């Protein structure tokens, strides 16, 4: 039986700072490395065999995957695809999430964070009233 396993990258440096990250290529935090190691250990403990790996182009995702591979003594090639990158946050990129929520309100903040059909512009975040 074919199985699909999805693993989100470990905590990034900007996740730890509560910042919108999107496509900015930030590294894992120390906690993120530990989370990746734990994921690798779970896969090892459950004796899960994986045939093919895909990851985004972002180093936090690649480092999560390579940590998992190392934990399982695997030296396998993996595929990267920009389509697996995190969503692009436009003008919100780099901003503190809590400060942004306080500025634009809870309703608009949730739309920006969770809507799949909302495009964020590269202008001032206050002008991004598209969703």
What residue spans do the PLM features occupy?
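Extreme N-terminal starter segment of soluble prokaryotic enzymes
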Residues: 1-5
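Short catalytic helix/loop segments, enriched in acidic residues and glycine
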Residues: 24-38
